[in-house]
């Protein structure tokens, strides 16, 4: 591994260690968050938000690194970006386009959108890990990040479900979420088409993880700090 790769890996490990230490200091275990189930959770709303914000930021960092690594390794000169625009499986969700729009959106709507985005990524992340494992010569930097993102997405979803339950007690979160149907594209024998499908999926993951991170930080500021942040 070159010195640049070692430095990047060291930075990620340091970030993960810092996040883990912060969570332990706050008395928040990573898994399970509530040993007796969400209904018996004693973790404060502030701690749940702190944990969720850190995890979502970490996921977005990993997503950006994985996309950049894939772009450098497989997409140079292929023109994949033009095919990736507006082709995400989550495009049907009416998400705010920028921070200003998100600030005008009710907190219940933002939380439902975050839950919808997280749930819509469970299936593609599982298959992303499976298919990347089968790729010949795939860099460890891509596979390790894919595995981590899948695990952290589940943790973040668990945390957001508990936040939703505390902020809106008794509410039923039953909004449908987009279903991903891109597995055949990840398994095609046409190498360029397969790489294009991976590129598109990673592009969408980076985009959606950025949205989740932005919405969560806004919710944290609005609900926990009464917009004084």
Swiss-Prot record:
Xref: SUPFAM superfamilies: 4-helical cytokines (SSF47266)
PROSITE patterns: SOMATOTROPIN_1, SOMATOTROPIN_2
Keywords: Disulfide bond, Glycoprotein, Hormone, Lactation, Phosphoprotein, Secreted, Signal
Record has Secreted as a keyword: yes
GO biological process: biosynthetic process; blastocyst formation; cell surface receptor signaling pathway; female pregnancy; lactation; negative regulation of apoptotic process; negative regulation of luteinizing hormone secretion; negative regulation of peptide hormone secretion
Top-level taxon: Eukaryota
Disulfide cross-links: 34-41, 88-204, 221-229
PTM annotation (Phosphoserine): residues: 56, 64, 120
A GO term, aspect molecular function: hormone activity
Major localisation: secreted
Subunit composition and interactions: Interacts with PRLR.
Annotated family: Belongs to the somatotropin/prolactin family.
Function of the protein: Prolactin acts primarily on the mammary gland by promoting lactation, mammogenesis, mitogenesis and osmoregulation.
Descriptive protein name: Prolactin
Gene (name only): PRL
